[in-house]
């Protein structure tokens, strides 16, 4: 007896993107790539798998990501601990060090691709999701911090988004954070009785992250904690003031958020998030900041850097809520045909039209004209090219508009095959 194979479903929190939504993804990525090119950013592609120690060192061993959320396994061939990337910055910095990219000049780079976190799936939070990661490596001044925020404001405008707001903070430099850390630990020790399990665990290892709590019982304690901003020295304040002045010059509104620390340990000086109320609990659309110590931390020569990451699924969700997105057509031209000779001719004509730069679907298989036209209309094609018996005999094609022109301009016309590509292209 043949055993019935139980069908396999996608892993929870790892979603298929089917042809309809995928077309919107492609349009979205086209906008994003054009936007990044306009600021001089070039694409890089790094592996999905990296050595686990890269993320433990780069992100921080006591972060939620490293402690709870990474997909990690042991390589059966050599015993190495490997991890599916939970974010892209560490891998891009690793690549810049390995390939000596910062030897002679700074670089503006970006990457688009999947990342993986072992989380409880919900709207806007998935186990496999996609990021747009943008990094400016080797740039030290607040002008590049400001440019990154301004370029994000431009992206929101390109996408027609309005309900996105900027939150801003400075984390200062390591020595300033050390002084603040000591004061913060004293504050947390005085409130140990109200700390939750995460708070008590992080009180000494990563006290700044305790303030980033979502626990309502700890909010008053967090609000009264010493502010890192009060510990900033002259250089850090000057950097932050320079950033704020440039944002004012660009007309960018923002809210100072002294509790904004981000979930990654490598940040210093500028940190920012773009947030919205339209995505429920997962309201952060984009987050980033400066990480001047990360290149050296991962074994390279000291080099400043700043970057951000956008969650693509969240931004696509927001885009689809904000504007009406036209579903892209499967093709421009759909060829219908009659008989075996018509089918063979259609295949040749399809290739000729593609040579001319047109997107073409040739109806597959044999069917009546009614069924073929139904499929042509469903494809979203503007024009149907008809190769019936008369057309095959006369070496012509009939052109029928499926959408677009009306009246006389929409009338069906017959043209010689030799002129077909030019006529179709003239119809734009």
From Swiss-Prot:
It comes from Bordetella parapertussis (strain 12822 / ATCC BAA-587 / NCTC 13253). This is Histidine--tRNA ligase. GO terms for molecular function: ATP binding; histidine-tRNA ligase activity. Keywords: Aminoacyl-tRNA synthetase, ATP-binding, Cytoplasm, Ligase, Nucleotide-binding, Protein biosynthesis. PANTHER family: HISTIDINE--TRNA LIGASE, MITOCHONDRIAL-RELATED (PTHR43707:SF1), HISTIDYL-TRNA SYNTHETASE (PTHR43707). Its EC number is 6.1.1.21. PROSITE patterns: AA_TRNA_LIGASE_II (PS50862). The keyword Lyase does not apply. It holds the Pfam family HGTP_anticodon. Belongs to the class-II aminoacyl-tRNA synthetase family. GO terms for cellular component: cytoplasm. GO terms for biological process: histidyl-tRNA aminoacylation. It catalyses: tRNA(His) + L-histidine + ATP = L-histidyl-tRNA(His) + AMP + diphosphate + H(+). InterPro entries: aa-tRNA-synth_II, aa-tRNA-synth_II/BPL/LPL, Anticodon-bd, Anticodon-bd_dom_sf, His-tRNA-ligase, HisRS-like_core, HisRS/HisZ, HisRS_anticodon. It is found in: Cytoplasm. CDD domains: HisRS-like_core, HisRS_anticodon. Its main location: cytoplasm. Homodimer.
């Amino acid at each position: 007896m043949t055993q019935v194979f139980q069908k396999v479903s996608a892993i929870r929190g790892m979603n298929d993107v089917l042809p309809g939504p995928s077309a919107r993804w492609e349009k979205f990525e086209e906008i994003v790539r054009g936007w990044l090119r306009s600021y001089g950013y070039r694409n890089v592609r790094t592996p999905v798998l990296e050595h686990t120690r890269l993320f433990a060192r780069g992100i921080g061993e006591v972060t939620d990501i490293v402690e709870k959320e990474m997909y990690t396994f042991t390589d059966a061939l050599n015993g190495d601990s490997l991890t599916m990337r939970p974010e892209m910055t560490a891998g891009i910095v690793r690549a810049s060090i390995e390939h000596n990219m910062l030897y002679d000049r700074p670089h503006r780079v970006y990457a688009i691709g999947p990342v993986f976190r072992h989380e409880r799936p919900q709207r806007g939070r998935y186990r496999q999701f996609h990021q747009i990661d943008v990094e400016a490596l080797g740039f030290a001044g607040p002008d590049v911090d400001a440019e990154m925020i301004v370029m994000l404001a431009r992206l929101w405008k390109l996408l027609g988004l309005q309900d996105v707001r900027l939150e801003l903070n400075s984390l200062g430099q390591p020595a300033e954070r050390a002084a603040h850390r000591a004061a913060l630990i004293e504050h947390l020790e005085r409130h140990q009785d109200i700390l939750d399990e995460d708070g008590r665990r992080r009180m000494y290892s990563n006290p700044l992250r305790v303030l980033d709590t979502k626990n309502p019982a700890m909010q008053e304690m967090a609000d009264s904690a010493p502010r890192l901003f009060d510990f900033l020295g002259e250089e850090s304040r000057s950097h932050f003031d320079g950033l704020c002045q440039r944002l004012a010059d660009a007309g960018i509104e923002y809210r100072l958020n002294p509790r904004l620390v981000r979930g990654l340990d490598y940040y210093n000086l500028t940190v920012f998030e773009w947030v919205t109320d339209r995505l429920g609990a997962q309201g952060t659309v984009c987050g980033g900041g400066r990480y001047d110590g990360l290149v050296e931390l991962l074994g390279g020569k000291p080099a400043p850097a700043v970057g951000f990451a956008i969650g693509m699924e969240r931004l696509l969700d927001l885009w689809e809520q904000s504007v009406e997105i036209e579903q892209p057509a499967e093709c421009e031209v759909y060829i219908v045909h009659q008989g075996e000779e018509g089918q063979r001719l259609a295949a040749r004509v399809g290739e000729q039209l593609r040579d001319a730069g047109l997107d073409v679907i040739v109806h597959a298989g044999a069917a009546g004209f009614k069924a073929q036209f139904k499929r042509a209309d469903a494809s979203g094609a503007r024009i149907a090219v008809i190769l019936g018996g008369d057309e095959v005999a006369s070496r012509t094609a009939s052109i029928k508009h499926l959408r677009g022109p009306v009246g006389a301009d929409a009338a069906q016309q017959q043209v010689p095959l030799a002129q077909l590509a030019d006529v179709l292209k003239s119809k734009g």
